[in-house]
From Swiss-Prot:
This is Autophagy-related protein 33. Belongs to the ATG33 family. Residues 126-142 have a biased composition (Basic and acidic residues). It is a multi-pass membrane protein. It is found in: Mitochondrion membrane. The chain crosses the membrane at residues 17-37, 60-80, 86-106, 171-191. GO terms for biological process: autophagy of mitochondrion; macroautophagy.
Amino acid sequence: MTATGTSVSLLKFVGTVSLGLLTGVSYSISSLALPALLRLPSSASASHGLSTLSAALKTPVLALTSLASAPFLISFFLAPRSSRHPYLLYTAILATLSSVAPILIPTPTPAPRRTASSAPRKSSRAKMEASYEVLGDAHSEPASDEDIEDINGEEVRAEVEGLTRSYLARTAISALGFAMAVVGIWGDGAPQSVVYVS
């Protein structure tokens, strides 16, 4: 095997493993991590968890997508003309398309958030002084919705469900590419027999 043949085989291996990891990570996010956010006790903690998870996933998912698509493209162009199988190009396109899938899938638009009331709020000192006055009062009312900055749980649920759908689409596309890569590599390694007909 020549140096080019070895490097092409190595590139195919790296691309296939990266595509398999991308498929597994996308599936784990859509089936385990995102549904767990909906079971958090408050919508504020779910919203914070969603933003933290989204920010933490951008770099690894982009790296896996790049490591999945670039080796297949490079191996397609480095391979000798007789070994340039179209599955290399198709797999690279599917890996790239899996990163674009979340943009293409429509997400439900949450209703606009309620703006805070225009009435001036009490200063923190005034709130503290008022809390001493009603400390022993059994009939005191809890803080109103205006006093507590609240995040709508339905908005968070819509965001989580939209992100889950996009990661499921990413999983499906990358799984199709992974299956194509495995079958293609298996076909590359199959012994080629030449039959002469006389």
